From Swiss-Prot:
Primary role: Positively regulates the activity of the minus-end directed microtubule motor protein dynein. Plays a central role in positioning the mitotic spindle at the bud neck during cell division. Targets cytoplasmic dynein to microtubule plus ends, thereby promoting dynein-mediated microtubule sliding along the bud cortex and consequently the movement of the mitotic spindle to the bud neck.
Name recorded for this polypeptide: Nuclear distribution protein PAC1
Lineage of the organism: Eukaryota, Fungi, Dikarya, Ascomycota, Saccharomycotina
Record organism: Saccharomyces cerevisiae (strain RM11-1a) (Baker's yeast)
Cysteine pairings via disulfide bonds: none
Pfam families attached to this UniProt entry: WD40
Designated gene of the protein: PAC1
Length: 494
């Protein structure tokens, strides 16, 4: 055996089969191309292939078989083995892809096992301190693991997601105007689905009413806003697992961008903002429009409500604070370079002095009930602002502070590579999602990014939701849900 034969990682039989496959492919190729495109070279090419077979094929029987198959009298016959080589080549490529997929799945499973082992260790050391079996401190310290607990698929891109305040149910709104309710313990089929709008749903909010008047029964309200210029209000009937429409709110003249529902005493109100540059306040019980004001010169994209105050973010790159009962604009924040996608108040939480921005710095801010807010923008940044105190007068609506009416940016979070779409605050953590297909967790105390989820979605991540930490009517749970352009919702649970 020669030196080059020793270097070839094939047995004699394997080498012979490979040579035959190569010759058969060359034979098929010259029949298909040379005879039609280079007819003048037909005989010379055919002779060269026959000569080559004499060198490569070891057995005389194999050579004779190939020569007879290559004879011109048999040119109408198609050897079924002539395409064996390209078929094998294609099979190898498919096998390589399959191997890569299996390796990725193995890595995912190994990571999931590590996360589960970590959770088991934490649970073994965990000591419950509250009646529901979880300490408030540990609940607020929770950061979701790398992989979701369940994956929900719908028919079109997910535009908004909301968790039921008390039950293991997630509400999903889509770009086709459909509204879904999924049981997180049996999510293969939705509990309910409804074509709630004729165009895309842009925003959704939920509220479990807490009427002190015994004549009114408490229930969950789901509010949706849409590109069809309408706002729909639904009652979630838990006993029948269905949406029951209460009313529609009409009045905006362009796309309704965001909607918010809240309760103060026995009064329930709904706030909405639109591309028509207005913000409207609605009475939940009768559907009347109580107030309309125009805080911005361009499209109002997002709002949040805290008591009698509304913060709004706009296409004009500013965010503004308004006293909604009077319509008085109180202060403005400038600093973003591109349109603002999301705004939120940062609520105070009790007994957490170690958490930055969650405790008032002065008694005046404590009495006012707010001090900080956060905004997310298309400029890829998230900014935390200190809101200036307005001039407060007894029995009168607040007015702007003549010496200080501008928000002060106290922290800028940078890390996303594209538009930041949504934000949610829980304890000392701020969660954000963006068009860079990632979800990030930030530490409010340090401003550092603690964790990044990069492979949750294959497209833009449009929305996310976590249980709020400032409402006693919401069950403290360790859950997070995300929704994306890839028609999927990822749910994380401990």
């Amino acid at each position: 055996m020669t030196n080059w034969q020793q270097q070839l990682p094939l047995t004699d039989t394997q080498k012979n089969e490979l040579d035959k496959s190569v010759l058969r492919y060359l034979n098929w190729n010259y029949k298909q191309t040379v005879r039609h495109e280079h007819a003048q070279d037909y005989e010379s090419v055919r002779h060269a292939i026959v000569t080559l077979s004499g060198f490569l094929l070891q057995e005389s029987v194999d050579r004779q078989e190939f020569i007879s198959n290559n004879d011109t009298s048999n040119e109408s016959m198609v050897d079924i083995d002539e395409l064996l080589l390209p078929k094998k080549w294609n099979s190898i490529v498919r096998l390589q892809k399959k191997i890569i997929e299996l390796e990725q799945n193995t890595e995912t499973l190994v990571s999931q096992i590590k996360d589960l082992n970590t959770q088991v260790s934490e649970l073994a050391q965990f000591k419950p301190t509250t009646s529901n079996g979880a300490s408030a401190h540990n609940v607020l310290k929770w950061i979701p693991r790398n992989l979701p607990s369940c994956l929900i698929n719908v028919e079109s891109s997910v535009t908004s997601v909301k968790l039921h305040p008390n039950l293991p149910i997630v509400f999903v709104a889509t770009d086709h105007g459909k509204l879904y309710a999924f049981d997180l313990f049996n999510y293969t089929i939705p509990l309910a689905s409804l074509q709630s709008h004729t165009k895309a749903i842009t925003s959704m909010d939920v509220l479990f009413t807490n009427f002190t008047n015994s004549s009114k029964k408490n229930y969950l309200v789901v509010v949706t806003a849409s590109k069809d210029l309408q706002i729909h209000v639904f009652k979630w009937v838990s006993e029948e697992c269905k949406f029951q429409q209460i009313r529609s709110l009409l009045g905006h003249e362009h796309i309704v961008s965001a909607v918010k529902i809240w309760q103060k005493n026995n009064d329930v109100h709904i706030a909405s903002c639109s591309r028509d540059q207005t913000v409207k306040i609605w009475d939940f019980h009768n559907g009347w429009s109580l107030k309309t004001f125009q805080p911005h010169s361009q499209w109002v994209r997002s709002i949040d409500v805290l008591g009698d105050y509304i913060i709004s973010g706009s296409h004009d790159t500013t965010l503004r604070l308004t006293h909604w009962p009077s319509g008085n604009g109180l202060s403005v924040g400038t600093g973003h370079e591109f349109p603002i996608e999301k705004v939120k108040f940062i609520h105070f939480i009790e007994d957490s002095p170690e958490i930055r921005f969650r405790t008032p710095s002065t008694d005046r801010y404590k009495n006012w009930g707010m001090q900080y807010c956060v905004s997310a923008s298309r400029d890829r940044t998230i900014k935390i602002w200190e809101i200036p105190l307005p001039t407060l007068m007894a029995h009168r609506a607040p007015i702007p502070n003549p010496t200080d009416s501008n928000f002060r940016c106290v922290l800028t979070l940078k890390g996303h590579l594209s538009w930041v779409r949504d934000i949610s605050i829980r304890g000392q953590y701020l969660f954000s999602c963006a068009d860079d297909k990632s979800v990030r967790c930030w530490d409010l105390n340090t401003g550092q990014c603690l964790h990044v989820w990069e492979k949750l979605h294959t497209g833009f991540v449009n929305c996310l939701d976590l249980d709020v930490d400032f409402d006693s009517n919401v069950t403290p749970r360790q859950m997070m849900v995300t929704g994306g352009l890839d028609c999927k919702s990822n749910v994380f649970m401990r």
